[in-house]
Amino acid sequence: MEIVGCRADESAYPFRPAAAMLFHGITGGHIQGIMEEMERRSKSADSRLAKSIQVNSRETRMPSLNPEKPTLCAGCGGKISDRYYLLAVDKQWHLRCLKCCECKLTLESELTCFAKDGSIYCKEDYYRFSVKRCARCHLGISASEMVMRARESVYHLSCFTCTTCNKTLSTGDQFGMKENLVYCRIHFELLVQGDFHQQLNYTELSAKGGGIAALPYFSNGTGTVQKGRPRKRKSPALGVDIMNYSSGCNENETDLDRDQTYPPSQKTKRMRTSFKHHQLRTMKSYFAINHNPDAKDLKQLAQKTGLTKRVLQGEQCSGFNSHTTRRLKIP
């Protein structure tokens, strides 16, 4: 933003070269000196109007002023007839018209101003509306400051701490997130285990074939993808596989006993399925006729026996394997 001159009034520059001038009672040497002085002043005034100005380390030249096309103010839209005006964001402004759109502070005496989406801001309001803010303390983050990122949130280094114990988390530490709150690994596991104990319906899970939803979020904070199959660690309170890097568990590897409860220190066991006599007879006679039933056949058989399709598939595989083995025995 610069203050530049404007040749709005011809009377402001009294010394201009004329095509013909009359001098009476003045010697030739004096006339020559007067003409040289007038020419020097005229060139000095023109050079001040045409000089280039330096803005933000790049050269910006003042637009040429066409007397036939008046210069208009970008703020009020009126004609600029003042001797001085402001040049900001490649537009001309009255001294009184360049102001912050939020606090209405006149920026005539300010060294800098900021423009965004066609609006002018002072320095304070621009940083208040445009700068990234820490998700924990909600204060602004400068462009030169080191930050920690998790999902779409940005944190100061000192603000990236566990919500429960306030432990500072650094690069490489494993952490979890729930509802945009950051937890260390220990407290995140305790939080997830508590949610599972409150929300899981073991009867419904067994009826649907088992399966536990993926953990909300779990990361080691490095932002890199682990190559190969991630290692798993058994949680002592649940039969859930918590991966060291990414969240989630395999629903095909988890079975819960709906009729038996276990103390927190004991691992859960796979549920053993027991059959009644009429169920065994029905399955045996059915699989003797059809060794490879499709989904529709299994559905009908499940309705007859009262068992799930998953149990029937397991019994089908075991029965088929034993049948094949018997046929391959050497007499």
From Swiss-Prot:
Annotated InterPro entries: HD, Homeodomain-like_sf, LIM_Homeobox_TF, Znf_LIM
Pfam families reported in the protein's UniProt record: Homeodomain, LIM
Annotated DNA-binding residue span(s): 268-327
Domain of life: Eukaryota
GO cellular component terms listed in the entry, alphabetical order: nucleus
SMART domains registered for this protein in UniProt: HOX (SM00389), LIM (SM00132)
Keywords carried by this UniProt record: DNA-binding, Homeobox, LIM domain, Metal-binding, Nucleus, Repeat, Zinc
A Gene Ontology molecular function term of the record: RNA polymerase II transcription regulatory region sequence-specific DNA binding
Region feature Disordered, mapped onto this chain: 253-275
Ranges of residues in domain LIM zinc-binding: 71-132, 133-194
GO biological process annotation, one example: regulation of transcription by RNA polymerase II
Subcellular location: Nucleus
Primary role: May be involved in gonadal development.
Protein name: LIM/homeobox protein Lhx9
